[in-house]
């Protein structure tokens, strides 16, 4: 089983990815984790990426594509995983299609989490993240056991710069321009399932599991 999760920033893809990977017993492959791994190991691709990020620029598709392909090639033995954060545009999606074809892999479903801007702004305002392990919390919906402290490593939680209102709106604009066309791309391939991302975590999970079960029959 191979799943792709799509949705605007702040919709909760990472949370849902963790839940689904646990229930379905498949690997959760996060683009953010792959980048952090390359940064930590000082790989050539990681070093190149840092140069663009330091200038406030998007990492070029060819670098991101190669980074993802390298990771998947090493971890391909399971052939069961979900992708969170990739592809981000149609060119990356076409690259991924070619990679799957060459690797004899088959995409099961693309899950698109939809929500309005006002709802997303409200949700993003309460989001907090651990600077050490990257675990995401929400002060109302997914609070830590101790306010402001990560359950895993006891680090003080922070609000990412990306989650501050002015930065978030810029990210949303980029999403609408670059990533939203993927909805049409995968819809035309009859691989898209759209879900209301503002429902509870359990409700969203239930809907996704039901559509996956239907596809298996």
Swiss-Prot record:
Q: Does the keyword Nuclease apply?
A: no
- Transmembrane ranges, per UniProt, are none
- Coiled-coil segments, which residues? none
Q: What is its EC number?
A: 2.7.4.3
Q: Which UniProt keywords apply?
A: ATP-binding, Cytoplasm, Kinase, Metal-binding, Nucleotide biosynthesis, Nucleotide-binding, Transferase, Zinc
Q: Where does this one sit in the cell?
A: Cytoplasm
Record-linked InterPro entries: Adenyl_kin_sub, Adenylat/UMP-CMP_kin, Adenylat_kinase_CS, Adenylate_kinase_lid-dom, P-loop_NTPase
Judging by the UniProt lineage, the source's domain of life is Bacteria
Q: Locate the residues binding Zn(2+).
A: 130, 133, 150, 153
> Where do the segments described as LID lie?
126-163
Q: Name one GO molecular function term.
A: zinc ion binding
- SUPFAM superfamilies found in the cross-reference section: P-loop containing nucleoside triphosphate hydrolases
What does the entry list as the binding residues for AMP?
31, 36, 57-59, 85-88, 92, 160, 171
GO cellular component: a single term: cytoplasm
Q: Which pathway features in its UniProt record?
A: Purine metabolism; AMP biosynthesis via salvage pathway; AMP from ADP: step 1/1
**Region (NMP) spans which residues?**
30-59
Which HAMAP family does the protein's record reference?
A: Adenylate_kinase_Adk
The record describes the protein's role as:
Catalyzes the reversible transfer of the terminal phosphate group between ATP and AMP. Plays an important role in cellular energy homeostasis and in adenine nucleotide metabolism.
The family note in this entry says:
Belongs to the adenylate kinase family.
Q: What is this protein called?
A: Adenylate kinase
> Which gene is annotated as encoding this protein in its UniProt record?
adk
């Amino acid at each position: 089983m191979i799943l792709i999760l799509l949705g605007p920033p702040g919709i909760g893809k990472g949370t849902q990815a963790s839940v689904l990977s646990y229930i379905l017993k498949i690997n959760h492959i996060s683009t953010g984790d792959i980048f952090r791994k390359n940064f930590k190991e000082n790989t050539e691709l990681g070093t190149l990426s840092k140069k663009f990020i330091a200038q406030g620029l998007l990492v070029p598709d060819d670098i991101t594509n190669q980074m993802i392909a390298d990771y998947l090639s090493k971890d391909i033995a399971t052939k069961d995983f979900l992708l969170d954060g990739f592809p981000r545009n149609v060119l990356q999606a076409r690259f991924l299609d070619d990679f799957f074809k060459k690797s004899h892999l088959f995409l099961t479903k693309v899950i698109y989490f939809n929500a309005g801007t006002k709802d997303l702004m409200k949700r993003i305002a309460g989001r907090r993240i651990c600077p050490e392990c990257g675990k995401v919390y929400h002060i109302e919906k997914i609070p830590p056991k101790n306010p402001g402290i990560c359950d895993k490593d006891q680090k003080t939680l922070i609000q990412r710069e990306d989650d501050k209102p002015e930065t978030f709106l810029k990210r949303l604009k980029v999403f609408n321009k670059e990533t939203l066309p993927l909805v049409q791309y995968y819809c035309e391939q009859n691989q898209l399932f759209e879900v209301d991302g503002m429902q509870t975590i359990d409700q969203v999970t239930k809907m996704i599991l039901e559509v996956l079960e239907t596809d298996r029959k």
